[in-house]
Amino acid sequence: MSNLNPGELGDLTDASKKEIAAYLDAENSKQKVRTSINQFTDICFKKCISRVDNGNLSSQEEECLASCVNRFLDTNIRVVRGLQNSQ
């Protein structure tokens, strides 16, 4: 990471400031997605995996995980669409 003097931020053009703001918004959005994925993984793992005794999932565990993740993804898609429609 570069060492940027905070005073230099005032020297940026409006276009550069908008570009930086857009970049930061995109990075924040990516972080939110990563956080959601981590939460889904944790919740679904706890819900579907009762014990880890080898490197394979049972067919029931695979089905549970797929269903769990799909349910969260469907819910998120609906929430995002609802937010987009309300804007």
Swiss-Prot record:
Membrane topology, record value: Peripheral membrane protein
GO CC annotation, single: mitochondrial intermembrane space protein transporter complex
InterPro entries referenced in this protein's UniProt entry, alphabetically: Tim10-like, Tim10-like_dom_sf
Top-rank taxon, per record: Eukaryota
Motif (Twin CX3C motif): 44-68
Paired cysteines (S-S): C44-C68, C48-C64
Keyword Transmembrane helix: no
GO terms for MF: metal ion binding; protein transporter activity
Entry remark concerning the domains of this protein: The twin CX3C motif contains 4 conserved Cys residues that form 2 disulfide bonds in the mitochondrial intermembrane space. However, during the transit of TIM8 from cytoplasm into mitochondrion, the Cys residues probably coordinate zinc, thereby preventing folding and allowing its transfer across mitochondrial outer membrane.
UniProt function note: Mitochondrial intermembrane chaperone that participates in the import and insertion of some multi-pass transmembrane proteins into the mitochondrial inner membrane. Also required for the transfer of beta-barrel precursors from the TOM complex to the sorting and assembly machinery (SAM complex) of the outer membrane. Acts as a chaperone-like protein that protects the hydrophobic precursors from aggregation and guide them through the mitochondrial intermembrane space.
Similarity remark: Belongs to the small Tim family.
Protein name: Mitochondrial import inner membrane translocase subunit TIM8
